[in-house]
Amino acid sequence: MTFVSDLFAIALGGSIGAVLRYLITLTVVSAPLSGWLTLHGSVGTTLANLLGCCALGGLFQFSQALVASDWVATGWAASLAHPRTLLAVRIGVLGSLTTFSTLIGETAVFASQGRILASSMLLGINVIAGWCLFWAAAAVVRNWTS
């Protein structure tokens, strides 16, 4: 029963993450400046990826603090500390919110259109800013849990 419950938690989290990603993209596309943003669909993907990296960094440090056992989660943090909840958030929500394959597809479209600079910038922003946000969030949570 545990395996099936884990799968259900991941599926539930995945549906939440997928809807969040769709809403982020819709918000960017319908923004007043969307005509100005020539990469508006890619901006939605980038925003979803960067938010996911930030959340994953915080979750990573949160998990590290739990393993270190010198910090005890209470309240909402105790609920998040449950292994099934971590699966639902990490693999479900964040896995479907962030989409590496969509990013690669969008960069390939720009490259095929001869927009090499746009393609390179899109990839670079996602990777470098995502990496920085991951560790920035981890540092914030580290300070909170110590």
UniProtKB/Swiss-Prot annotation:
Q: Which residues cross the membrane?
A: 8-28, 47-67, 91-111, 121-141
InterPro entries linked to this entry:
FluC (IPR003691)
- How is this chain's activity regulated? Na(+) is not transported, but it plays an essential structural role and its presence is essential for fluoride channel function.
Q: Where does Na(+) bind?
A: 95, 98
- What membrane topology term does the record carry? Multi-pass membrane protein
One Gene Ontology BP term is: fluoride transmembrane transport
Localization (cell): Cell inner membrane
Does this UniProt record's set of keywords contain Plastid? no
Q: Name one Pfam family in it.
A: CRCB
The GO terms this record gives for MF are:
fluoride channel activity; fluoride transmembrane transporter activity; metal ion binding
Record field: catalytic activity: fluoride(in) = fluoride(out)
Q: Which UniProt keywords apply?
A: Cell inner membrane, Cell membrane, Ion channel, Ion transport, Membrane, Metal-binding, Sodium, Transmembrane, Transmembrane helix, Transport
What cellular component GO annotations does this protein have? plasma membrane
The record's function comment reads: Fluoride-specific ion channel. Important for reducing fluoride concentration in the cell, thus reducing its toxicity.
Family the UniProt entry places it in:
Belongs to the fluoride channel Fluc/FEX (TC 1.A.43) family.
Designated name of the protein: Fluoride-specific ion channel FluC
Q: Which organism is it from?
A: Rhodopirellula baltica (strain DSM 10527 / NCIMB 13988 / SH1)
Q: Source taxonomy lineage?
A: Bacteria, Pseudomonadati, Planctomycetota, Planctomycetia, Pirellulales
